[in-house]
């Protein structure tokens, strides 16, 4: 049975993890270009969510949001690849730890489930969109 949290807590957890990653990269000192790449990834995700098509069926909604989510992670890993101080490894570690939080309705649960059983999470889709938007707003205020 997973931990049940509302959208505010989910966005707070994501914001803390992103802040932790930024601090780790900033401490490395040799990865200055990574901030531009990571920022571009966040902006791309934000643009995708802001231009989210309305009126799609549930299956298409999930597929669309999960595509945005996976694109964000791929973009982030690409942006961190050039950093020699282990930022990519840190990001992968944070991603794995986030999956282990087992927060019901999280994008990791919605998009990463290998069993394809995303049906019960469909009502949580608007909350996920709002919480992700809140996390992006929190990030941009840093």
From Swiss-Prot:
It is found in: Cell membrane; Synapse. Its main location: membrane. Residues 1-27 form the signal peptide. It holds the Pfam family NRN1. One of its GO terms (molecular function) is identical protein binding. It is a lipid-anchor; GPI-anchor. Residues 117-142 form a propeptide. The keyword Ribosomal protein does not apply. A lipid is attached at residue 116 (GPI-anchor amidated glycine). InterPro entries: Neuritin_fam (IPR026144). Keywords: Cell membrane, Glycoprotein, GPI-anchor, Lipoprotein, Membrane, Signal, Synapse. One of its GO terms (cellular component) is side of membrane. One of its GO terms (biological process) is regulation of synapse maturation. Component of the outer core of AMPAR complex. AMPAR complex consists of an inner core made of 4 pore-forming GluA/GRIA proteins (GRIA1, GRIA2, GRIA3 and GRIA4) and 4 major auxiliary subunits arranged in a twofold symmetry. One of the two pairs of distinct binding sites is occupied either by CNIH2, CNIH3 or CACNG2, CACNG3. The other harbors CACNG2, CACNG3, CACNG4, CACNG8 or GSG1L. This inner core of AMPAR complex is complemented by outer core constituents binding directly to the GluA/GRIA proteins at sites distinct from the interaction sites of the inner core constituents. Belongs to the neuritin family. Promotes neurite outgrowth and especially branching of neuritic processes in primary hippocampal and cortical cells. This is Neuritin.
